[in-house]
C-alpha cells in the first residue's frame, strides 16, 4: 500500500513538471496552488498525556500561496499510535486474575491497544522570503483551527472475543472529540526546477474535547467530563504545485 502511494505521488510530480514546466518561481513571487502529503510525530500534553504516549499522523491537504506570500490551507490527518498507558486495566472486569480475556473458544485472547483518531483544520499564515533561493520560499508561520477526534483502539488478534466487539468495544474506547487550535512555524522550499517542494517545521495544537460515550463499561459510569490537551509535533510536507495555464500561454502572476 505504501509503495502504491509513493508511486502515485511520483507520477503526479512528473505530470506537474511536464505540464507546467514553463512557470518559473525563481524570478518573482507568484500564485502557487498546491496539493500535499504530510507526516508528523507528536508528543501529547495535558489530559491525553495521562493515557497516550507519542503518536504519528499522516494526511494531506490543499494550500494556495498568493503573490504577496499569504498562505491559505485546508488539511486532514489520520492519527495513530501504539503507546497506551494502563491499557490492560480497561478490561479488568472481564479478565482473569492473570489479566487475560477468555475468548469464545475458551482460550486466552490476544488483546492489543492503540490510539486512533483524526483532525480536520483550516489554516492561514504568511511566508517571509528571506534566507531563501527564490521569492516563493522561506520561513513561514501559520495558525488554524478545526475538529479533533481521538479514542483507544482495541484489537482482538484472533477476532474471537465477543466482549470487545461491536457496541461492547465502544464501552472501553474513551471516544472524545471537540475543537482544536494550531500554530505552525517552519521553512517552505519551492525549487526552481519544480521537482523538490517541501516543508519542515514544528506544530503546536491545543484541543478542547469531551467524552461522548453513554457509559464506560470498566467503571459502570457515564463520563461527560471535558479534556484539555496539547500536541507538540515535528512535521514534514511534500508539495505538488498546480500552476494554471492556457493552451499556449502560461500565466505569471
PLM region spans:
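Sec-dependent N-terminal signal peptides
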Residues: 4-14
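Short glycine/proline- and aromatic-enriched beta-strand/turn motifs that initiate or cap beta-hairpins
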Residues: 22-71, 237, 241, 253
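Short loop/turn motifs that connect adjacent beta-strands in outer-membrane beta-barrel proteins
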Residues: 22-31, 68-69, 130-138, 190-198, ...
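Residues that define the transmembrane beta-barrel architecture of outer-membrane proteins
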Residues: 31, 54-58, 114-120, 137, ...
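Residues on the lipid-exposed face of transmembrane beta-strands in outer-membrane beta-barrel proteins
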Residues: 37, 60-64, 76, 120-126, ...
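Structural signature of outer-membrane beta-barrel domains
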Residues: 42-44, 79-83, 127-129, 146-152, ...
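Extracellular/periplasm-exposed beta-strand and loop segments of Gram-negative cell-envelope proteins
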Residues: 46-51, 84-116, 150-178, 209-233
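Predominantly the C-terminal beta-signal and adjacent terminal strand-loop region
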Residues: 183, 189-253
Amino acid at each position: 500500500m505504501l509503495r502504491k502511494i509513493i508511486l502515485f505521488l511520483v507520477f503526479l510530480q512528473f505530470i506537474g513538471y511536464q505540464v507546467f514546466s514553463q512557470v518559473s518561481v525563481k524570478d518573482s513571487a507568484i500564485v502557487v496552488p498546491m496539493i500535499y502529503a504530510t507526516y508528523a510525530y507528536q508528543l501529547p500534553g495535558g489530559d491525553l498525556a495521562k493515557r497516550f504516549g507519542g503518536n504519528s499522523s499522516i494526511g494531506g491537504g490543499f494550500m494556495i500561496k498568493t503573490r504577496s506570500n499569504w498562505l491559505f490551507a485546508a488539511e486532514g490527518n489520520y492519527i495513530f499510535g501504539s503507546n497506551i498507558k494502563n491499557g490492560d486495566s480497561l478490561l479488568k472486569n472481564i479478565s482473569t486474575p492473570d489479566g487475560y480475556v477468555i475468548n469464545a473458544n475458551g482460550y486466552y485472547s490476544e488483546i492489543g491497544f492503540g490510539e486512533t483518531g483524526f483532525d480536520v483544520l483550516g489554516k492561514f499564515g504568511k511566508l517571509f522570503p528571506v534566507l531563501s533561493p527564490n521569492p516563493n520560499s522561506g520561513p513561514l508561520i501559520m495558525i488554524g483551527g478545526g475538529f479533533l477526534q481521538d479514542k483507544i483502539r482495541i484489537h482482538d488478534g484472533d477476532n474471537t472475543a465477543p466482549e470487545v466487539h461491536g457496541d461492547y468495544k465502544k464501552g472501553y474506547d474513551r471516544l472524545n472529540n471537540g475543537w482544536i487550535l494550531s500554530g505552525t512555524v517552519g521553512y517552505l522550499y519551492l525549487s526552481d526546477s519544480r521537482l523538490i517542494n517541501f516543508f519542515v517545521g514544528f506544530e503546536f495544537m491545543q484541543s478542547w474535547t469531551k467524552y461522548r460515550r453513554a457509559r464506560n463499561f470498566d467503571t459502570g459510569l457515564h463520563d461527560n467530563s471535558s479534556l484539555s490537551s496539547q500536541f507538540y509535533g515535528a512535521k514534514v510536507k511534500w508539495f505538488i504545485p498546480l500552476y494554471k495555464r492556457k493552451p499556449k500561454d502560461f500565466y505569471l502572476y
